[in-house]
Amino acid sequence: MTNIRKTHPLXKIVNHSFIDLPTPSNISAWWNFGSLLGICLIIQILTGLFLAMHYTSDTTTAFSSVTHICRDVNYGWLIRYMHANGASMFFICLFLHVGRGLYYGSYTYFETWNIGVILLFTVMATAFMGYVLPWGQMSFLGATVITNLLSAIPYVGTNLVEWIWGGFSVDKATLTRFFAFHFILPFVIAALAMVHLLFLHETGSNNPTGLISDSXKIPFHPYYTIKDILGLLILILVLMILVLFSPDLLGDPDNYTPXNPLNTPPHIKPEWYFLFAYAILRSIPNKLGGVLALVFSILILILFPVLHTSKQRSMMFRPLSQCLFWILVADLLTLTWIGGQPVEHPFIIIGQLASILYFTIILFILPIASMIENKLLKW
C-alpha cells in the first residue's frame, strides 16, 4: 500500500515541498534563512492578530490602547514586544537571505529572484505602516515625512499624497487605512512566499559551489528539517533575549510620547532596518532625486541577473568578487550608521560617498571584476 502522504491531494503538496523534496547535499547554514523567514512571518501574524484584538485605530485612542495592551492585557507586553522585535529579526533574516542570494548567484533563477524582490518591497511597506500604528511622536512624523516623499512625483504628486492621507494632513483617516493595510499585507506576503517556493521548486535549490547538483541530492526530511530546527532554536533564543532583557534596544524613545503635530523631535529617523535607504535618500539634496535613489537602491536587485558577467555562478571560487562583496556589506553598514546620525558636517559627506560607492560597486566595479576574473582563468 502506498503511503498516504504520497497519494492524498493535500498531503502530497506538503510531501513534495518539505519531506521528499530532493535537496543538494552540500548547502550550508546560509540556506536556513528561508525557513526562518517563514517562521518569522508566522510569529508576526499570530502576535499581530492578538494585538489587533485590543488595538483601536483612532488617533485619540491608538496610543492609549497600546499602553493598555502593555499594562492591562495578560502578557500583552510580551505579545507587543515579540511583535516589535520580531520585525527586527524578520529583517535580519531577510538581509542575510538576500546577501546569500547575491554571494552564491541564486539570482540566476529569475522568477524566484524577482518574486523575492517584490516580497522585500511588500515587507518593507508592511513594516513602515506597522510603525505608524502606535501613534507615538516618531510614528506620526515618520508617516508624514515618508508619505510626503510622493509629492516629489511631477504633476500628480500633491494629489497622490492627499489621496493617501485621506485629507490635508496625516490624521484619523490615514491611521485607519494604515491599520487596514498592515493587517491584510502579511497574508499577501504569505501568498507571495508560496509563489516564491513554487518557482524555486521548479528548478531546485542552488548550492555554495553554484554547480549543478542533480547527481547528489538527498531528501529534505530528516536531514534539513533537523538543520532548520537548530536555526529556529537560535532565532527564538535571540528573539527572546531581546524581548525579555532589552525590548526597547532597537526602538526610539520619542515613540513613548504621544503624537503631537505642533512639536517636532530634533532628529527624525526610521527603524534601524530602513536606515541604509534613509541615508541614501538624504545624501541627495534634490527631493525627486533622493526619492528615485531610495527606490532604486532596492530595485537595483532586479538588475543583478543582467549585470552577472562571470562564467561562474557562485562567488565561492572568485576572490576578487568576494572582496568587493564584503566591501559592499561594509558600505551598507556604514550607510546604516549614517542614517541614524544628524545631518551635520562629517556625516553628510560620508553618507554621500557611501551612497556613490554602493551604486558604483553594483553597476560597474562588480561586473568589470567578473570579466577580469574570466580573463585570469582564460575562460
UniProtKB/Swiss-Prot annotation:
Keyword Methyltransferase on entry: no
Keywords, sorted A to Z: Electron transport, Heme, Iron, Membrane, Metal-binding, Mitochondrion, Mitochondrion inner membrane, Respiratory chain, Transmembrane, Transmembrane helix, Transport, Ubiquinone
UniProt-annotated binding residues for a ubiquinone: H201
Pfam families with a match to the protein in the record: Cytochrom_B_C (PF00032), Cytochrome_B (PF00033)
Gene3D superfamilies in the cross-refs: Cytochrome Bc1 Complex, Chain C
Gene Ontology cellular-component terms listed: mitochondrial inner membrane; respiratory chain complex III
Binding site for heme b b566: H97, H196
InterPro entries: Cyt_b/b6_C, Cyt_b/b6_C_sf, Cyt_b/b6_N, Cytb/b6-like_sf, Cytochrome_b, Cytochrome_b_C_euk/bac, Cytochrome_b_N_euk/bac, Di-haem_cyt_TM
Note accompanying the cofactor annotation: Binds 2 heme b groups non-covalently.
Highest rank taxon of the organism: Eukaryota
Needed co-factor(s): heme b
Transmembrane regions listed in the UniProt entry: 33-53, 77-98, 113-133, 178-198, 226-246, 288-308, 320-340, 347-367
Localization: Mitochondrion inner membrane
GO molecular function terms attached to this record: metal ion binding; ubiquinol-cytochrome-c reductase activity
Biological processes annotated in GO: mitochondrial electron transport, ubiquinol to cytochrome c
Miscellaneous information on this protein: Heme 1 (or BL or b562) is low-potential and absorbs at about 562 nm, and heme 2 (or BH or b566) is high-potential and absorbs at about 566 nm.
Family: Belongs to the cytochrome b family.
Subunit field text: The cytochrome bc1 complex contains 11 subunits: 3 respiratory subunits (MT-CYB, CYC1 and UQCRFS1), 2 core proteins (UQCRC1 and UQCRC2) and 6 low-molecular weight proteins (UQCRH/QCR6, UQCRB/QCR7, UQCRQ/QCR8, UQCR10/QCR9, UQCR11/QCR10 and a cleavage product of UQCRFS1). This cytochrome bc1 complex then forms a dimer.
Known role: Component of the ubiquinol-cytochrome c reductase complex (complex III or cytochrome b-c1 complex) that is part of the mitochondrial respiratory chain. The b-c1 complex mediates electron transfer from ubiquinol to cytochrome c. Contributes to the generation of a proton gradient across the mitochondrial membrane that is then used for ATP synthesis.
Descriptive protein name: Cytochrome b
Provenance organism: Spermophilopsis leptodactylus
UniProt gene name: MT-CYB
